[in-house]
Amino acid sequence: MTKQIIVTDSTSDLSKEYLEANNIHVIPLSLTIEGASYVDQVDITSEEFINHIENDEDVKTSQPAIGEFISAYEELGKDGSEIISIHLSSGLSGTFNTAYQASQMVDANVTVIDSKSISFGLGYQIQHLVELVKEGVSTSEIVKKLNHLRENIKLFVVIGQLNQLIKGGRISKTKGLIGNLMKIKPIGTLDDGRLELVHNARTQNSSIQYLKKEIAEFIGDHEIKSVGVAHANVIEYVDKLKKVFNEAFHVDNYDINVTTPVISAHTGQGAIGLVVLKK
């Protein structure tokens, strides 16, 4: 059977150890901080990036250059291996589209997948992909199985500070200033891969109660298989959420990491991303 190689970007929130252990090739996004450029997870960590956000510095994220994908695909596919390239939602970044364009410019056999998610929402798809490759499942069947898995994943983001939303033009400066004064915490979810703001919470506790209600509705009669929490330097918030979810859903295993800069650049310090995978 033809060898299958997995490629992704730097936004899955999976550990470096896991990615390396499973021979997953990462093409990182780029970050710009006060005009200086950095390679995500190479020149700067997620924790370091959040420190810059806390200082209210000008930060931006950008997709990898198309040449990065072309070089990777040509090198990885030169022995005839199939390449499965899975990336953060096309509704959040141009990374998927750039990867697809690159796949059409090389001789290698490349299948590019839009995860329609980010953080552990992408990470759980990668983990499932790893298992399917180990089982020898064909690439066409893998695409179908990931489409089905995606229906069992729900992602929410609780905005920490509104400054980044103001800078990104998602809300007006006036609304942002009022929201900051009232300590409003907008909550967003991904709708077909695009971030939609769906609720405004006033406190951490009220945001957690809202998430509990929404997740209960999402899982219905199913059990929770995995919970991933990516946070922007607010581990005490994560601990509160875990306590509520332990009691409500009997979850005792969590994947926790500092959130990808692609999220924290828009959500600010104090944000969390919650990803639930139901059985």
UniProtKB/Swiss-Prot annotation:
Annotated transmembrane regions: none
Pfam families (UniProt xref): DegV
GO terms of molecular function: lipid binding
Keyword field: Lipid-binding
Binding site for hexadecanoate: 61, 93
Domain DegV: 4-278
Biological role: May bind long-chain fatty acids, such as palmitate, and may play a role in lipid transport or fatty acid metabolism.
PANTHER family to which the protein is assigned, alphabetical: DEGV DOMAIN-CONTAINING PROTEIN DR_1986-RELATED (PTHR33434), DEGV DOMAIN-CONTAINING PROTEIN SPR1019 (PTHR33434:SF8)
Stated name of the protein: DegV domain-containing protein SAR1438
Annotated source species: Staphylococcus aureus (strain MRSA252)
